[in-house]
């Protein structure tokens, strides 16, 4: 039986044909729009929002996610340009009654400093599952997931792609397949290992279904946990923890790297654990906690 096509694909194809026929866009530009808008429309679909009903807040949340996954400012600017053109097209063609992207502006092409939690905020967030549902079915899953994200600094896509074969808990390592299927070994602390073992032994066997396969983190139906579900779990626990900063699964990665560097970890070692191909991508974490840098200067500089 053929897979049902998402309704937004037809709208996207109509827009791309308009770009080619009416505005003489090149094949490369068309391909860029296909990639950028495909990601945006798939995200809206996963959120349960139709393109013609999107609000400015939806677009801003999507742009925030682009920041959180580490997309360069120039790429984000290109995405915004595509989104603005798309919604303008929907309004012109009377496929929508408003243009939610009209007042969405291009970011300045400067380095984006990601949101990072303090060590105290992270501790509060990691305890939130115990406060939210200490006797609930999903407490073990949510607690294990949050602890694992912070302990390893893995991307959410890497987390959701984990299988039992990737875990080497007796050795204190996890095998991760990152961007471009690049493989790396990342250490896992004992606290995260303890919660992962409890989840895997006490909860996951009862959650499994025919669609579970070997995926570590499962949803309530026994299928693989989706990216959006992981986002919701993080945000719901952030509310419980009283954290008002913008937060996503990627915040754990940013905080992981920042806290390691604050503790004196070597930049190259952190680069290896994060799976960055370039040291430049890791260096951003040396510029985040200005208060920490000031404190170091005050403590160690003779004129501090």
UniProtKB/Swiss-Prot annotation:
Q: Which InterPro entries match?
A: CB, DNA_brk_join_enz, Integrase-like_cat_sf, Integrase_catalytic, Integrase_recombinase_N, Integrase_SAM-like_N, Recomb_XerD, Tyrosine_recombinase_XerC/XerD
Show the active-site residues. 155, 179, 250, 253, 276, 285
Annotated PROSITE patterns: CB (PS51900), TYR_RECOMBINASE (PS51898)
Is Protease a UniProt keyword of this protein?
no
Tell me where in or outside the cell this protein is found.
Cytoplasm
The Core-binding (CB) domain extends over: 6-91
Q: Tell me where the transmembrane regions lie.
A: none
Keyword list (alphabetical) reads: Cell cycle, Cell division, Chromosome partition, Cytoplasm, DNA integration, DNA recombination, DNA-binding
Molecular functions per Gene Ontology? DNA binding; tyrosine-based site-specific recombinase activity
BP GO annotations: cell division; chromosome segregation; DNA transposition
What this chain does, per the entry, is described as:
Site-specific tyrosine recombinase, which acts by catalyzing the cutting and rejoining of the recombining DNA molecules. The XerC-XerD complex is essential to convert dimers of the bacterial chromosome into monomers to permit their segregation at cell division. It also contributes to the segregational stability of plasmids.
Q: How does it assemble?
A: Forms a cyclic heterotetrameric complex composed of two molecules of XerC and two molecules of XerD.
Member of which family? Belongs to the 'phage' integrase family. XerD subfamily.
Question: What's the protein here called?
Answer: Tyrosine recombinase XerD
Recorded source organism is Chlorobaculum tepidum (strain ATCC 49652 / DSM 12025 / NBRC 103806 / TLS) (Chlorobium tepidum)
The opening ranks of the lineage are: Bacteria, Pseudomonadati, Chlorobiota, Chlorobiia, Chlorobiales
């Amino acid at each position: 039986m053929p897979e049902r096509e998402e309704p937004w694909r037809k709208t996207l194809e109509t827009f791309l044909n308009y770009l080619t026929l009416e505005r003489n866009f090149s094949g490369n530009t068309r391909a860029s729009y296909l990639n950028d808008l495909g990601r945006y429309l798939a995200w809206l679909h996963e959120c349960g929002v139709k393109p013609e009903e999107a609000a400015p807040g939806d677009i801003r949340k999507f742009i925030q996610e682009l920041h959180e996954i580490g997309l360069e400012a120039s790429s984000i600017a290109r995405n915004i340009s595509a989104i603005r053109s798309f919604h303008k097209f929907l309004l012109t063609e009377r496929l929508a009654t408003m243009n939610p992207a009209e007042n969405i502006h291009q970011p300045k092409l400067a380095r984006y400093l990601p949101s990072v939690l303090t060590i105290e905020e992270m501790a509060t967030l990691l305890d939130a599952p115990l406060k939210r549902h200490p006797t609930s079915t999903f407490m073990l899953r949510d607690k294990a997931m949050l602890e694992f994200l912070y302990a390893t600094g893995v991307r959410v896509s890497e987390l959701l792609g984990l299988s039992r074969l990737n875990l080497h808990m007796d050795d204190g390592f996890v095998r991760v397949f990152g961007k471009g299927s690049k493989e790396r070994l990342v250490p896992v602390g004992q606290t995260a290992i303890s919660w992962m073992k409890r989840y895997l032994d006490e909860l996951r066997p009862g959650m499994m279904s025919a669609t579970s396969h070997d995926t570590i983190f499962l949803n309530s139906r026994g299928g693989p946990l989706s990216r959006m579900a992981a986002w919701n779990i993080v945000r719901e626990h952030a509310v419980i923890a009283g954290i008002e900063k913008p937060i996503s699964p990627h915040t754990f990665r940013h905080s992981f790297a920042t806290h390691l560097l604050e503790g004196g970890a070597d930049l190259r070692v952190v680069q290896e654990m994060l799976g960055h191909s370039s040291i430049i991508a890791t260096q951003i974490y040396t510029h985040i906690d200005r208060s920490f840098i000031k404190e170091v200067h005050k403590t160690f500089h003779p004129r501090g």
